[in-house]
């Protein structure tokens, strides 16, 4: 099979119907903040134990096609010495590596950030391929305010995403391109739709300019929501309509799949919105792309609450993960029942 065919096949596998992707790629800094919120010390061993809890969850593979890992996690191992990547591969779960090196302020553009990490990326991708990674993720972040995002900020990050995607495909790795339009802010739903459409149009323009094979790409997107500080929160049906319109106006049909980040919504709200999107899909007789979830906080928040850093809570924490995954798998089919919460 040619490289292109393999990439296309892997991209399709990642968006297998009714399954999602677990985003467990918190940087040590973010993971430490999450530990501290539980009253736990920000220690490497606790971070390892937490990832072990997630990846050893029985039945994980029934609901996820892949797990996104941070560099420190793909190099880490379970108690018995099994590398985390091997543990996932043995379950039929694809290790996905986060390859961006986070954001830095965009010089001369107040209030905006750009994502870094292109230097040495081709070599790093080769190394990750050898460790078993078959997909990679890169996140760009856009803030909505009266004056942002600027055209320059959108262009810079989309050019970077396209370069990263081209390097991934060259290395036999499926790029998961994640332009996150932040939920935080006091913008309306209409403004969120306008910005997300602008960002996605620029992103696909840049991917095409760079001759990236769109059939071998996964889009990781925000849902289109009014800002967290906006006077009224958007109903699930309105989120679904706005999100669909945005994608129809920006995402080429060749793209095999779009997966959602949860973006700071409560786990329940993220699931409810996913369900409304799937219901709309059924009403419309299907979308050109497969849709799925790729939540981090939206899946892990209840797990962390149940765990509390205690070994005796591992079983309860794993049960909380399976429950959240089941609910999202149902939502992906438009059959989520809030009374099951
Ligand atoms: C886990 O968060 C990921 C990485 O964040 P940091 O580098 O800031 O720690 C992030 O890219 C995540 O994969 C997506 O944003 C989805 O997470 P949410 O919580 O929005 O579902």
Q: For each predicted feature, which ranges?
A:
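Catalytic core of soluble alpha/beta enzymes
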Residues: 183-254
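Hydrophobic residues within beta-strands of alpha/beta enzymes
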Residues: 67, 136, 175-176, 217, ...
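Helix-rich catalytic cores of soluble enzyme domains
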Residues: 121-207
């Amino acid at each position: 099979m040619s490289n292109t065919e393999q990439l296309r096949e892997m991209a399709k596998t990642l968006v297998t119907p009714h399954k999602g992707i677990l985003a467990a790629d918190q940087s040590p800094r973010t993971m430490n903040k999450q530990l501290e919120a539980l009253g736990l010390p920000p220690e490497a061993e606790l971070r390892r134990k937490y990832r072990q809890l997630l990846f050893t969850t029985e039945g994980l593979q029934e609901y996820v096609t892949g797990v996104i890992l941070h560099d420190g996690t793909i190099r880490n191992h379970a108690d018995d010495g099994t590398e985390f990547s091997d543990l996932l591969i043995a379950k039929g779960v694809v290790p996905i590596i986060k390859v961006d090196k986070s954001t830095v302020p965009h010089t001369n553009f107040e209030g905006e950030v750009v994502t870094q990490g292109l230097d040495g990326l081709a070599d790093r991708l080769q190394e990750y391929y050898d460790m078993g990674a078959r997909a990679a993720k890169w996140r760009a972040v856009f803030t909505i305010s009266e004056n942002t995002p600027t055209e320059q900020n959108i262009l810079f990050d989309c050019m970077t995403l396209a370069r990263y995607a081209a390097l991934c495909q060259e290395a036999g790795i499926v790029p998961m391109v994640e332009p996150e339009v932040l939920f935080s802010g006091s913008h309306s739903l209409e403004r969120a739709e306008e910005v997300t459409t602008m960002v996605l149009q620029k992103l696909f323009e840049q991917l095409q300019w760079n001759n990236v094979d769109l059939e071998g790409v996964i889009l990781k997107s925000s849902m289109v929501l009014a800002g967290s500080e906006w006077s009224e929160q958007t109903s699930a049906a309105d989120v679904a309509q706005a999100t669909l319109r945005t994608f129809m106006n920006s995402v080429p049909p060749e793209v095999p799949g779009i997966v959602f980040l949860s973006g700071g919504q409560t786990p329940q709200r993220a699931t409810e919105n996913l369900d409304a999107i799937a219901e709309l899909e059924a009403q419309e007789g299907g979308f050109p792309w497969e849709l799925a979830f790729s939540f981090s906080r939206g899946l892990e928040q209840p797990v962390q609450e149940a765990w509390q850093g205690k070994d005796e809570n591992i079983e309860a924490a794993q049960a909380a993960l399976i429950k959240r995954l089941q609910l999202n798998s149902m939502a992906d089919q438009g059959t989520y029942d809030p009374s099951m919460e």
